[in-house]
Regions:
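Class II aminoacyl-tRNA synthetase catalytic cores and aaRS-like
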Residues: 1-516
């Protein structure tokens, strides 16, 4: 089936063919010796410096024998000045008259060699002595323009288009690129903090025979050679604990996790988390470590602990506030749920108009009350501690109250950011907790945990006292970049598949029997 081209796309393909006709390959294979970035040239400007730059040509002002254009590389933009007789020293002026003026388009990649100078108005620029075509774009970019007053016109702002075509979004919206650069810096800072304490970065399986470590619905796939079902991991917790059993004192992992659940502004089916486990520590130590780590990250990435999140200013300066879960519910509802059974909790939910269903046990009911009535009130970083034991099947019972657990969740701007335990290391207690989860599954709770027999076997060999913590990288990036949607901090967020023209090949048709 013929591809439907716009008028601009047709013209660009004609230009591409014209380049080849005059002996210029629009997609050359040879290395181009870039030695400078535009950002550095402008921030550390030295007049008369010889430079080699490459990037997209963005904007062009043709003025007879001389022209100005903007060159955009990975670090920013700089003005370039092109004189016909400078780049065409002989009688043949094709490179300027035909290639630069007629056959190059907005968005094409070019390479230039030249010398830095300041224009009469003081703008850092590059006087071009050599021009090379590096890559021809056959599809036009959105023409986003900014006027002298800083107003943006024809902006590329439609969220669905931006998320589907992130490659375009990154080119024309500099703030988007800045968000992802900060995301990378956040992860680097976190990694440096943890390795600086001597902890080992590890990798654990993504495909797992038992989806454990969290209460969530998994994605299921099938391994043909083994003829068995496998699950995309919902968490990496149980494998990291196996490594603690194996003798490591501190491990951490930046892990992709997958949960087959709904999507909204704070949830994507595929997301990134960091989990860490350290021996001979408890959840109180982990609270201190978590707040120290977040304060360090803020200073490394932003230079301040104060962050604007929507209308709120949030301060990540340690120490953070501590509030028990039962205390939080009492503070915001006036009801003390301590010691209540399931029937009493259902009455509380009815009174507070918290929606619940018959599949929910005590833990889920308490979680729903907290989520509906309390969570959104915690704007400043706050550790919610001491969760009821029914909510935390992998967590050690509280040393002072066996009905509670040594667990905290860190709330920021009304959302959970991190979750941590004094880890349960009693294999007999752990088996009983898993069996309670099976009962919940029998009642219809599709987020109840599976029994992982191999993990129980590992615990039976002995696991030292350990504290573990997991933190959502996507959500942390949202907070530190001031974004209110997780789609803004994931390069390619999950979306409904795009409908292409009929006649497009079915990807499954190209799979062998063993790969379907």
């Amino acid at each position: 089936m013929a591809i439907q081209l716009s008028e601009q796309e047709e013209q660009r393909r004609l230009s591409l063919n014209s380049l080849r006709e005059i002996g210029i390959e629009p997609f050359p294979a040879a290395l181009f010796p870039v030695d400078s970035l535009t950002k550095n040239l402008k921030s550390e400007f030295t007049e008369g410096k010889k430079v080699v730059l490459a990037g997209r040509m963005m904007n062009r002002r043709i003025m007879g024998k001389a022209s100005f254009a903007e060159l955009q590389d990975s670090s920013g933009r700089i003005q370039i000045y092109i004189n016909r007789d400078e780049i065409c020293a002989g009688e043949d002026k094709t490179l300027y008259n035909d290639v630069f003026k007629k056959l190059l388009d907005f968005g094409d990649f070019i390479g230039v060699k030249g010398e830095t100078f300041l224009t009469q108005v003081g703008e850092p620029s590059v006087k071009v002595t050599e021009l090379t075509v590096l890559s021809k774009s056959v599809k036009p970019l959105p023409m986003v323009k900014t006027d002298d007053q800083g107003n943006v016109h024809d902006a590329f702002t439609d969220p669905e288009l931006r998320y589907r075509m992130r490659y375009v979004d990154l080119v024309v919206n500099p703030d988007v690129k800045d968000t992802f650069i900060k995301r990378s810096k956040i992860m680097s800072s976190m990694r440096n903090f943890l390795t600086g304490k001597g902890y080992l970065e590890v990798e654990t399986p993504i495909l797992q025979p038992i989806p454990g470590g969290a209460a969530a619905r998994p994605f299921i796939t099938h391994h043909n050679s083994l003829d068995t079902s496998l699950y995309m991991r919902i968490a990496n917790e149980l494998y990291l604990k196996r490594l603690i059993v194996g003798g490591f004192d501190g491990v951490f992992e930046f892990a992709k996790a997958f949960r087959n659940e709904g999507m909204d502004k704070t949830h994507n089916p595929e997301f990134t988390m960091m989990e860490m486990y350290v021996t001979y520590k408890d959840y109180k130590w982990m609270m201190e470590t978590t707040e120290q780590m977040l304060e360090t990250i803020c200073m490394d990435v932003l230079g301040t602990t104060k962050v604007k999140i929507g209308k709120n200013e949030v301060n990540f300066k340690a120490p953070f506030k501590r509030v028990t879960m039962i205390g939080a519910i009492k503070d915001h509802t006036g009801i003390d749920i301590n010691g209540m059974n399931e029937a009493q909790l259902r009455q509380v939910c009815a009174k507070l108009e918290v929606p619940v269903d018959e599949t929910m046990g005590k833990g889920k009911l308490i979680d729903e009350i907290f989520g509906e009535k309390c969570e959104g009130n915690y704007i400043q970083p706050t550790f919610i501690t001491d969760y009821p034991i029914e909510m935390s099947p992998l967590c050690k019972a509280h040393r002072d109250n066996p009905e509670l657990t040594e667990r905290f969740e860190l709330m920021v701007n009304g959302k959970e950011l991190a979750n941590a335990y004094s880890e349960l290391n009693d294999p007999i207690d752990q088996r009983e907790r898993f069996e309670e989860q099976v009962k919940l599954a029998d009642r219809g709770d599709d987020e109840a945990m599976f029994i992982d027999q191999d993990f129980l076997r590992a615990l039976e060999y002995g696991m030292p006292p350990t504290s573990g913590m997991g933190i959502g990288i996507d959500r942390l990036t949202m907070f530190l970049t001031g974004n209110d949607s997780i789609q803004e901090v994931i390069f390619f967020p999950q979306m409904r598949p795009e409908k292409w023209e009929s006649g497009e090949p079915n990807p499954k048709e190209n799979l062998t029997d063993d790969s379907k």
